[in-house]
Curated annotation (Swiss-Prot):
This is Flavin prenyltransferase UbiX. Its EC number is 2.5.1.129. It comes from the Bacteria. The keyword Transferase applies. Belongs to the UbiX/PAD1 family. FMN binds at residues 9-11, 35, 86-89, 121.
């Protein structure tokens, strides 16, 4: 299996990084494309270097290389994840505004009817944002903002990140076992009674 991973400049670079780590761990090949803003966000928010990220991906593409393999529908892959996804990137994807390889690869995923998952990072949202989300969804994208769940009783920031990353990879039917899944009220009640 091969998945394209795009990273925009939105806050939340750790989501893209953790996705790359998880995919590498389970042997999924990845094509990585990062915007220039993503590189700045990675440096600002994390201790990872761009070299570290390149080591996590099978292949790394320059944002301006619109002739790269992932810019063509004939290049086979299971789909694409943009994590994090800025509103600017959402807007370009929703409107097929192919100004760089990140957007072109997303547009190709949509036109080829492949999975495109967008980890949108913005709050609060105004009506224009909601309309862009609707338009992207109507075009075939899956909007999956990293909203934390608490039923698994997260104890660390990593627990919260891992739950969202697992939700993204569930879209590709990949089991990465990064957090405790919901097993039902029965087990919780049984544990409390002991």
């Amino acid at each position: 299996m091969r998945i394209v991973v795009g990273m925009s400049g939105a806050s939340g670079a750790i989501y893209g990084i953790r996705i790359l780590e998880a995919l590498q761990r389970i042997g999924v090949e990845t094509d990585l494309v990062m915007s220039d803003s993503a590189k700045r966000t990675i440096a600002y928010e994390t201790d990872y270097s761009i070299s570290d990220l390149k080591g996590l991906a099978t292949c790394v593409h320059d944002i301006n290389d619109v002739g790269a393999s992932i810019a063509s529908g004939s290049f086979r892959h299971a789909g694409m994840i943009i994590a994090p996804c800025s509103i600017k990137t959402l807007s370009a994807v929703a409107n097929s505004f192919n100004t760089n390889l990140l957007i072109r690869a997303a547009d190709v995923a949509l036109k080829e009817r492949r999975k495109l998952v967008l980890m949108l990072r913005e709050t609060p949202l105004h009506l224009g944002h909601l309309r862009l989300m609707t338009q992207a969804t109507e075009n075939g994208a899956v909007l999956l903002p990293p909203l934390p769940a608490f039923y698994h009783r997260p104890k660390t920031l990593d627990d919260i990140i891992n739950q969202s990353v697992t939700k993204v990879l569930d879209q590709f039917d990949l089991d990465v076992d990064l957090f405790g899944r919901w097993t039902g009220n029965e087990e919780r009640e049984l544990a409390k009674s002991r």
